[in-house]
């Protein structure tokens, strides 16, 4: 039996797929910029024009997953040992995450882990009915270098990151494959992506679908290159 490799999936038609979509973030305070919503709507229209069934769904994850994921984030920041005389070399946010992580009890960590496992199972029960799920990749157009840390409080840096990455972060928990498609551009020439997430082990379908969308849109980047390239 011949097993397709990723390069072969890129030249294989995906067939007619059933694709869910949603654009409502569950992270408190996260708002999706109009330009990002325009990219999302255009991507949905492209998928429909290619013959796929596009279905609107509610977010499969609830707002409670944010706090649970945050506890895990704190703990994982402590995984690698850092010598006492090197702690000050860490970025301020990394130091703060480690402080929270070391202050997190084992029961709190295990409770968050168990809650995320239950949330993942519940979400997969919904999304497994579809071949892929379409969302914005992030909530805002590209931010300037230093924007996340251009605040007085390091906790606000973390909040900005959570609001910005409201859609992709959860896939670090579920293990689902996901791909960013740079299909849209701001008036200033900055790329805006949309994200397709697949079933567990469904990388091949995502690659085939992404290649089909790229072909239909005449390529992702075309001749758009920074002058330094």
What residue spans do the PLM features occupy?
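Short helix-loop capping/hinge segments that flank enzyme active sites or metal/cofactor-binding pockets
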Residues: 11-23, 72-124, 136-140, 180-183, ...
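Structural helix-boundary/capping segments
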Residues: 1-23, 41-50, 110, 121, ...
């Amino acid at each position: 039996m011949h097993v397709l490799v990723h390069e072969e999936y890129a030249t294989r038609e995906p067939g007619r797929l059933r694709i869910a979509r949603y654009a409502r973030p569950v992270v408190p305070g996260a708002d999706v910029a109009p330009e990002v919503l325009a990219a999302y709507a255009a991507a949905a229209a492209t998928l429909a024009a290619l013959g796929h069934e596009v279905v609107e769904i509610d977010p499969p994850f609830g707002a409670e997953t944010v706090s649970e994921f945050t506890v895990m984030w704190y703990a994982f920041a402590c995984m690698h040992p850092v010598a006492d005389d090197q702690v000050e070399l860490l970025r301020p946010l990394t130091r703060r995450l480690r402080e929270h992580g070391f202050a997190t009890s084992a029961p709190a960590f295990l409770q968050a882990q168990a809650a995320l496992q239950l949330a993942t199972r519940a979400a997969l029960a919904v999304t497994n009915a579809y071949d892929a799920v379409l969302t914005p990749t992030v909530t805002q157009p590209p931010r300037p270098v230093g924007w996340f840390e251009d605040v007085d409080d390091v906790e606000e840096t973390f909040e900005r990151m959570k609001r910005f990455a409201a859609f992709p972060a959860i896939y670090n928990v579920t293990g689902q494959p996901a791909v960013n498609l740079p299909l849209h551009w701001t008036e200033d020439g900055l790329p805006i992506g949309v994200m397709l997430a697949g079933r567990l082990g469904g990388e091949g379908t995502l690659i085939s679908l992404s290649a089909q969308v790229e072909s239909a849109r005449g390529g992702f980047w075309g001749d758009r290159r920074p002058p330094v390239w």
